Amino acid sequence: VEILKYFKKKKGVYFNKKGWYLIGCEMPIQITPIKTYSNVVFVGYLDIVMYHEPTNTIKIIDIKTSKTTWNKKKKNDKGVRSQLILYKYFFSKLYDFPIENIEIEFFIVKRKLYENCDFVQKRIQIFVPPSGKTSINFSLKIVNDFIKRCFEPNGKIIEQHYKKNISEWSCRFCPWKFDEVNCPKNPKLLKLLKIA
């Protein structure tokens, strides 16, 4: 409720009405990333899509909630950034809209404010990830590699053991992080499960 009150009061700061038109909310996109894998479809729902008529620009906004604002680590997480970058790329392909005229941004809504704080806190943080050619190619490679590794061209799932992508971040809430025997990072356990 507090978030909505804050947003109603400050909406003009985040959304300018002049020349902007709302294209859609929760706008679905469906596309086949690799033509030879016609049964493997990328599906996404774009939270907010807006059009700026004077500059012929589309803006895709992805709303995220967070306990606090995003730190440097979260902003640099290429997996998180890839979602919006792929939305930009596939929107361009699907609607034949110039990719250089598509902007993307994360609209991060902060759930918690610090008590007894000496400075004014904002409930909303805007983060615009880099989305040039290099970022697009990186994100496409992730998706294409995943499709080729996990699916046959007819769309059938390739049954096999897949190596876990374990990072220090995933250990944070793991129930076995202090259990040497059951820890997924334990090399002996990985060898036993044949996923190392």
What are these regions (language model features)?
Residues 1-70, 96-100:
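Catalytic cores of nuclease domains that cleave nucleic-acid phosphodiester backbones
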Residues 41-43, 79, 166:
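A generic fold-level signal
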Residues 47, 80-82, 124-130:
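Short, low-complexity, polar/charged sequence segments that are solvent-exposed and flexible
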Residues 71-72, 115:
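Generic domain-boundary/flexible-linker signal
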Residues 72-82:
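Short alpha-helix boundary/capping segments
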Residues 82-90:
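Short amphipathic alpha-helical face segments that pack within enzyme cores
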Residues 89-196:
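Metal-dependent nuclease catalytic regions and adjoining charged, substrate-binding loops involved
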